[in-house]
Amino acid sequence: MRQLTLLIILFITKIGLSQEKTPNIILMIGDGMGLTQISAGMYANNNSTALEGFEYIGLSKTYAYDQFITDSAASGTAMASGVKTYNGVLGIDSKNIPKKSILEICQEKGYNTALIATSSIAHATPAAFYAKIDSRRKYEDIALQLSEHNVNLFIGGGEMFFNKREDKRNLLDEMSDYDFVKNLDKLSES
């Protein structure tokens, strides 16, 4: 059974950015979740899900550039950057051109950004929002790219891609502007 991954991207406006309140964006992705899985969830819960309370819900076509059956890398890139790519590729279009993601665009506009994943933070779905790489399986390279991205907050697994690396670098030590914690109590103290 395929594990569903929930990824939440929070874009929080800077205080005083403008007189008008700029809306926040929260993108929740159920990795591997389609209409069939949503329907099954409804049937299992007396024809009701929390999705019904959302003001906005959207569907997108996230198939790969060259195949209708996609993987998390190609579909994540489609959601994050609005372009089709090959299965296994993150943040690079079908012509091998790196593309900006919505997370990067929001960072440029002064928003705070966050990535939260129930999987490794270097997994294809969250990585589609910050990585530009030809293989979703290059986890250590993906972790390095995250360490260079200035995401305000990230939560997820995959610590070994940051501190038990083949190149012997400890990215956690190098990321001195971040507090790294391993439980919710420590998170609230951070």
Regions found by a protein language model. Give the residues of each.
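N-terminal catalytic scaffold of extracellular/periplasmic and nuclease hydrolases
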Residues: 19-165, 169-189
